[in-house]
Amino acid sequence: IFRGNASSLPNYGAETIGLTGLPFMFKDMEQFKAMADSSLGQEMLDSVDAADCGYVALGWLVEGPRQMFITQKAYQKLGKPTEFTLDMMKGLKIRVPETDLMVSTMDALGASATPIAYAELYTSLQSGVVDGAENGVTSYVANSFNEVAPYFITDAHTFGCGVILMNKDKWNSLTDEQKGWMNEAAKAASAACYDFNAKQEQEVFDSFAEKGITKLEVTDLSKWQEACANVYAAHDADLIARLQSGNY
């Protein structure tokens, strides 16, 4: 049993749940949680088992938005802006996880998506191999990326769609009673994760000044959303509409 990423599961054949990682799918953590707690959220989890990819999904781990951060050199090259706009993305080398969805999202925004192993990200930022990267704010600070990329961009291009995954063969070996215990534990973990992340994110943002981090607000978000239209076009329009509706 482990925490996986919904956006990575299409790599294993579970296409449906990966749609939750589409750019700008949810406006905030509250909407994401509402979806996760709904029948649609359960439908997304059930799709993993139906995909016969070797896993069953027991619950959601609702995390905050993934946002970008850039190095001092990239910031200076952009003219030391006090806010961030879509046109500034052009040509920036942004490290992304090696998933088709994240690569296509960054490319749609005008950046040069650059898949690099997470363990190599700090040195890649430090040496200038990439101009920036993207992640949740807590991971950004916990991994000290702020030391080499102190400019944080509030674009919230997607959310950390964590999923509690279990080996399917192991799941099938459990009794119905044991499966009930696992489902209850997953439900408790999901609730605790949401509360913890919401609190921790605010604490990290409050520490920006003392850590020397500059927050660059995105001022033309509608243009970012429009730029990603082609990313959406490749996927199930009806399911996307249900996910975005907010009526779960």
Describe each PLM feature range.
Residues 1-31, 50-51, 55-248:
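N-terminal secretory/targeting leader peptides
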